[in-house]
Amino acid sequence: MNDQPWMDSEWMQKMRTKRADAAVTIRTRKFLTNRLLQRKQMVVDVIHPGLANVSKDELRSKIGKMYKADKEVVSVFGFKTHFGGGKTTGFALIYDNVEALKNFEPKHRLVRIGLAEAPKGGRKQRKEKKNREKKFRGVRKSKKPRKE
């Protein structure tokens, strides 16, 4: 139960639904077709007055719909919200196909959109494994160090 009764009022409920239905405008500028990397690239301005930031997943689907492309080939990144809120600017890339996306996008962005798997284990574990394997120079490397 809330300590503030006005939070559960009818007016507050109406405001919540009004904010959820508020329009989000997406504008693109600096549009460029990059044939070498098999993509279209652009700067995206998202205008969302009175709302929190729009999720990247939602932006991917809306930009895909704007350019008649599948959501899977759209990559969005680098979004910064302007002071005071209401406007966010970032970048979008629309690839010709999923293979081009997998070839040219950085691995961390592929992990974020679910097209690649994050590396297992931490940085320290990888370094320790590398150094263990270096100890046996000149002999066949195995997972377990040899007992002498």
Curated annotation (Swiss-Prot):
Residues 121-148 have a biased composition (Basic residues). Gene3D superfamilies: 3.30.70.3370. The keyword Ribosomal protein applies. Transmembrane segments: none annotated. The gene is RPS24. This is Small ribosomal subunit protein eS24. Residues 115-148 are annotated as: Disordered. InterPro entries: eRP_eS24_sf (IPR053709), Ribosomal_eS24 (IPR001976), Ribosomal_eS24_CS (IPR018098), Ribosomal_uL23/eL15/eS24_sf (IPR012678).
